[in-house]
Amino acid sequence: MLEHIERDGGTIAVDVSGTGPLVVLAHGMGDSRHSYRFLVPELVAAGYRVANVDIRGCGDSSAGWAGYSRTDIAEDLVAVVRHLGGPAVVVGQSISGGAATIAAADAPDVITGVVELAPFTRAQSFDLGGFLRNQNHHRSGTVQLLRVMAAGSLPGWLAYLDLAVPTKPSDWAAERSRIEDALRRPGRMAVLQAMTKTTPADAGARLADVRCPVLVVQGGADPDWADPAAEGRRILADLPTGLGDLAVIDGAGHYPHTETPAEVLALVLPFLGRTLTATTTGGDRA
């Protein structure tokens, strides 16, 4: 069931399905809740109530927000959890991985776990050596993202996606067309450009404040980093000792939940069982 939650003069669209403990899904920039099309039915079948969110400015959520930072998105996610009734585990990809971190730090009473998929969760340093060495992958992806950041280039974003999804799902041609059509809607490319200009430093500053378990999943072929596994280890190092776990999926890029959904589910379902089911006492809301 699609709901619209009022937030600061805008609306956040949330598609809720299933019954059971609450799992909130938040996609990355330039995308929509359709990004989780392979995970939602499996999570529902496993006995979870799934709230699949269109983050601000994307999908069926409104555009024209004053800000698109991870802190802004985190406030929306906490509002979703409180509206639906927690506790919840929040799954966030890319920019929403950082937002999920902030949400967990801000609302430990209702967020009991975080899954970060290919997350931008800490301030980035430019790896010149990796940039020069990895010319066919990391370097190419960075160049396309710079086109989006500097000029709001839709062709640049589509070229980036072709690199960022090295393991193409069977519906990739249709999915790529869907994304392109969505970004041609008025104001949507401006939202994407604004998101590329945000810094993950706000999320990195809150890693030490997180008190719930965190699972970081990196794609080994993610073009956003010269060494994706090293980025994951840095996130864990900034969390309180013992809270974080890292998994790297070989061959996956920046969208492991669409490229390798079975592998992601094999990691996420046990995590949910440990961090959510045992703490949930009821309160399902259809």
Task: Show the residue positions of the predicted features.
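Conserved loop-alpha-helix segment in the C-terminal half of the alpha/beta-hydrolase fold
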Residues: R211-A252
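Short N-terminal helix/helix-N-cap motif within the alpha/beta-hydrolase-1
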Residues: R33-P41, D60-A63, G98-A99, S125, ...
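N-terminal cap/lid segment of alpha/beta-hydrolase-fold proteins
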Residues: M1-T11
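Flexible "cap/lid" loop of the alpha/beta hydrolase fold
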Residues: T101, A105, T112-M149
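Catalytic active-site module of serine/aspartate enzymes centered on a nucleophile-bearing elbow/loop
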Residues: P240-A286
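Conserved alpha/beta-hydrolase catalytic His-Asp/Glu region
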Residues: S125-F126, V148-A208
